[in-house]
Amino acid sequence: QPTAAIALDREEISELPHFGDDLYRAINVLPGTSGGDFSARFAVRGGLYDETLVTLDDQELMEPFHLKDFQGIFSIIDPEAIGGVELTPGGFTAKYGDRMTGVLDMVTRSPKATRAGIGISLTTAWANAGGLFSGGKGSWLASARRGYLDFILKAVADDDDDGAPPSPRYWDAFGK
């Protein structure tokens, strides 16, 4: 019998506890998943993190992480761009290929009205906008983020230290 999928809409995702405005860290608290404190990567039902298929609007994402030298500390997915997710922890059909442990299917949101926003969090600054066109027959969405861990590390670095502090910087943009 297939395992029941866990489906979450935008509001439910925002209510999950997570760090750094990271969708993957929110997924990491769902039943059947496990992960580390430092990395955004998660595993499903004891498998390896790369045994889970990740799709965004039916397109497979390979290694969707920033700062891979730091164990993929943040995902490339802006939670502001996501309308919903569905996690299937096992028991899925061959349609999903050779993945063994699970499927994480994400769908981007479709704006219902024109709106824009900017924000700042503990680790990220972001801006997004979305709206309708053609009399409401279509919608558009744009999102950009810039992580600023590099600024934080430079600010707390010891001036007597001979080596330069690590400079973990990242940015991403999304549009549809």
Segments the model singles out, each with a brief description of its role:
Residues G35, A94-Y96, P111-R115, F133-G138:
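Short loop/turn motifs that connect adjacent beta-strands in outer-membrane beta-barrel proteins
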Residues L53-T55, G84, V103, R115-G119, ...:
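Residue-level detector of the transmembrane beta-barrel scaffold of outer-membrane proteins
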Residues Q1-T3, G97-M100, G130, L153-A155:
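Short aromatic-enriched loop/helix-cap "lid" or pocket-rim segments at secondary-structure transitions
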Residues K112, W126, Y148-K154:
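Gram-negative outer-membrane beta-barrel proteins
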Residues D69, I152-D159:
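Outer-membrane beta-barrel translocator domains and adjoining extracellular loop/strand segments
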Residues Q1-T93, V103, V107-S110, T124, ...:
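Periplasmic N-terminal accessory/gating domains of Gram-negative outer-membrane beta-barrel systems
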Residues Y96-D98, G119, S167:
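A generic structural micro-feature
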Residues S121-R146, D160-K176:
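Transmembrane beta-barrel wall of Gram-negative outer-membrane proteins
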